């Protein structure tokens, strides 16, 4: 009898662990609907809609945390890219611009990390503020390539635009959470 009870409890616990997150997951149609409210639907569907963590997301707070994580991943990838391309920019303007981007991506990384931590605490206004600061640092990295000297093509435009678009998604989710 005791063995049957233990087996039954293990089965129910396993069932709860496996089924509970899925049963309470945010429906995929809600993610599609959210993405349709963004300025770049295919981008949103690519980065949020296909994220393997989305099926386990219970609510918009979890989706917000995933979007912040996606931003942090883009920032980290850009930082790695900076290290790879830095030697291609040996002129004074290129070196200065790469250093501005390296510094700004350091700021963005720290801000998105803290935003994620505050998102866990549901401190949404602080999340919004930090996501803006991180995004503005990335935007400045894009803009520095057009300031103070000859215009150059930024080697980080891909990452800069991804962070900018993810920021729009973060702000959209933020607005839904606070209104």
From Swiss-Prot:
A single MF term (Gene Ontology): pectinesterase inhibitor activity
Compartment(s) where it occurs, according to its Swiss-Prot or TrEMBL record: Secreted, Extracellular space, Apoplast
Chief site of localization: secreted
Disulfide bonds: 35-44, 101-141
InterPro entries for the chain: Invertase/methylesterase_inhib, PCW_Enzyme_Inhibitor, Pectinesterase_inhib_dom, PMEI_plant
Organism superkingdom: Eukaryota
Keyword Metal-binding: no
Tissue specificity annotation: Expressed in seeds, buds, and mature flowers.
GO cellular component: apoplast
Signal peptide range in chain numbering: 1-25
Transmembrane segments: none
Keywords for the protein's UniProt record, in alphabetical order: Apoplast, Disulfide bond, Secreted, Signal
BP-aspect Gene Ontology terms: regulation of seed germination
Similarity section: Belongs to the PMEI family.
Function in brief: Pectin methylesterase (PME) inhibitor that targets PME from seeds and modulates PME activity and pectin methylesterification during seed germination.
NCBIfam families xrefs: PME_inhib (TIGR01614)
Name the record gives this protein: Pectinesterase inhibitor 5
Source species: Arabidopsis thaliana (Mouse-ear cress)
Gene name of the record: PMEI5
